[in-house]
Amino acid sequence: SHEIRTPLNAIVGFSEIMAVTEDEEEKHEYLEIIQKNSNLLLQLINDILDLSRIESGKSEMHFQQVEISGLIDEVEKVHQLKMKSNVELKVIRPAEEFWTSTDRNRVMQVLFNFLSNAIKNTESGVITLGLKHEGDWLKIFVSDTGCGIPEDKLPRIFTRFEKLNDFVQGTGLGLSICKSIVERLGGRIEVSSELGQGSTFALYLPYQ
């Protein structure tokens, strides 16, 4: 409830202040705060609904044959434009095609979350999107040279409302949703991180 009340209180509070403020510059500043918290609240509600549907089994996984190398290229094209000026996005993948039965849209949702976190937490350096074939698994990973995750937080990052760090705004539900999705796909997520050095999030999909 705290996660919902915080942006809601900001919206109500600054709306009341804005109603009695005559200075146009101050009004604009308050409006930006209201919009920011409104977007956060909307994202939070959407994430809660998505997580609830996935965990209850009401959100179906649509399995089909998916070519993962091409999917990686598609994800890369979408995110190249989102890179900060001091950050390079690199792709490392084999030349050959890898087909497997999975839910294409859900895999992309997980990778979008990994990359979104990497972009938020990396001010300069390199973000790497990669694909490796490891036996019965396809490993898709996102590595960054960002701020990293404190060691005491690593065991809790998939807990609901747990944020990767205290510097970046978010709902704290993205990784919980990713974990639920990947488990439904028959896969797993592995994370390694070092504070001040960066993080790697790896999605393992069964290779059939």
What do the PLM-derived regions correspond to, one by one?
Residues 52-63:
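Helix-loop junction within the histidine kinase core
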Residues 36-41:
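Short alpha-helical segment of the dimerization/phosphotransfer core of two-component systems
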Residues 19-25:
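Short acidic helix/loop segment immediately C-terminal to the autophosphorylated histidine
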Residues 62-67, 84-98:
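Conserved catalytic submotifs in the C-terminal HATPase_c
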Residues 13, 149-161:
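Short conserved segment of the HATPase_c
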